[in-house]
């Protein structure tokens, strides 16, 4: 029992000692904390002073830094713009080069196409020329050319020139026919059409009186009215007589007149002189492939002799102008009229029916009597 009580007392003392120690420790820690606070406060004041100085220095350096930064930004922007411009120029040059290349290629293709077309056209022309040459050599073509020339001569004579539909079934027809002078008598032919299938004498124009196209009339007049044409005249008062001195002037005048009519594409020319007894010279020209044939017509014998002497001069002068003389014919006016009348008779025989054949095929009197029976027709030919 006593032992336990002793231990408790000891423990109580020990506990009291411990409490004293704790109080001492608490006091020591508080003192230390206060000391530390003082130190920290002093250091904080120093730090604040240092920070304020640094802030002032930094505030001074801020505008210089901003200036530097703005300059750097401007420099960078300029470099960017320069780079962009160079890039754009480079791209534009590339595009321009590409376009030029494309154009050149197109031009080359176009030139090739043109060259090919020209080759094809030249080949076709050569083929056509070869065929045409072969065709020219053929005798049928030669005959066709002869027929064309004959038809052109026939057109120059103009047998059907005075024919017009206006003259048919008109009261003033006869007055118009009288004004058109002709070498032949005005022979009018009525051509009546039959129904050859039925072999009946019924006339087409009896059934349809209003249709004038079923009846055709032809008037044979050999020449056009020469008053309408403009004949070239050269009057020279100096050329009075056929003297030897004035022969050169005569020759030059005739040569000039022939060349002038050829250049104007006229087939006729006329030269009249001041002395009336010499008369005038009528010239007819025919041109074929730069080859000329001249027909002189005059009634005076001295003029004919002079024209015969002019032949070598005319040949030389026309050769200088690129024209060759095939023939030169000298006629009287009476011979030319007879020659023309013979030609006209031949052409009329070729283009109209003969008298016997006309009587066999068409009984004109019978048809005429049948026309009289119909009272609807007012005029008869």
From Swiss-Prot:
Pfam family, one: Flg_hook
Gene Ontology terms: biological process: bacterial-type flagellum assembly
UniProt keyword annotations, A-Z: Bacterial flagellum biogenesis
Gene Ontology CC, one term: bacterial-type flagellum hook
CDD domains (UniProt xref): T3SS_Flik_C
Task of the protein: Controls the length of the flagellar hook.
Family: Belongs to the FliK family.
Domain comment in the entry: Two-domain protein with the central portion of the sequence acting as a hinge or connector between the two.
Name under which the protein is recorded: Flagellar hook-length control protein
Organism: Buchnera aphidicola subsp. Schizaphis graminum (strain Sg)
């Amino acid at each position: 029992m006593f032992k336990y009580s002793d231990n408790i007392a000891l423990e109580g003392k020990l506990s009291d000692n411990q409490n004293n120690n704790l109080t001492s420790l608490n006091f020591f820690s508080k003192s230390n904390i206060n000391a530390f606070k003082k130190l920290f406060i002093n250091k904080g004041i120093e730090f604040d002073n240092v920070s304020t100085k640094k802030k002032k220095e930094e505030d001074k350096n801020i505008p210089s830094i901003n200036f530097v930064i703005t300059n750097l930004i401007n420099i960078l922007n300029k470099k960017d713009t320069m780079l962009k411009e160079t890039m754009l120029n480079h791209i534009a040059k590339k595009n321009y080069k590409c376009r030029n290349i494309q154009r050149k290629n197109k031009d080359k293709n176009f030139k090739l196409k043109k060259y090919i077309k020209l080759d094809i056209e030249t080949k076709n022309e050569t083929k056509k020329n070869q065929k045409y040459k072969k065709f020219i050599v053929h005798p049928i073509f030669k005959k066709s050319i002869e027929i064309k020339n004959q038809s052109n001569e026939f057109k120059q004579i103009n047998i059907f020139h005075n024919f017009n539909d206006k003259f048919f079934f008109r009261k003033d027809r006869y007055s118009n026919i009288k004004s058109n002078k002709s070498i032949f008598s005005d022979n009018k032919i009525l051509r009546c059409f039959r129904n050859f299938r039925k072999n009946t004498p019924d006339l087409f124009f009896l059934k349809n009186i209003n249709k004038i196209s079923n009846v055709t009339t032809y008037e044979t007049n050999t020449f056009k009215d020469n008053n309408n044409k403009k004949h070239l005249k050269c009057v020279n008062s100096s050329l009075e007589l056929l003297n030897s001195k004035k022969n050169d002037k005569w020759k030059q005048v005739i040569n000039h007149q022939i060349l002038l009519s050829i250049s104007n594409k006229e087939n006729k020319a006329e030269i009249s002189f001041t002395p009336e007894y010499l008369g005038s010279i009528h010239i007819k020209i025919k041109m074929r492939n730069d080859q000329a044939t001249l027909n002189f017509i005059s009634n005076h014998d001295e003029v004919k002799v002079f024209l015969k002497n002019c032949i070598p001069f005319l040949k030389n002068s026309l050769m200088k102008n690129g024209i060759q003389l095939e023939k030169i014919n000298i006629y009287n006016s009476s011979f030319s009229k007879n020659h023309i009348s013979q030609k006209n008779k031949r052409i009329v025989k070729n283009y109209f029916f003969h008298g016997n054949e006309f009587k066999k095929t068409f009984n004109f009197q019978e048809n005429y009597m049948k026309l009289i029976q119909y009272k609807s027709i007012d005029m008869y030919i």
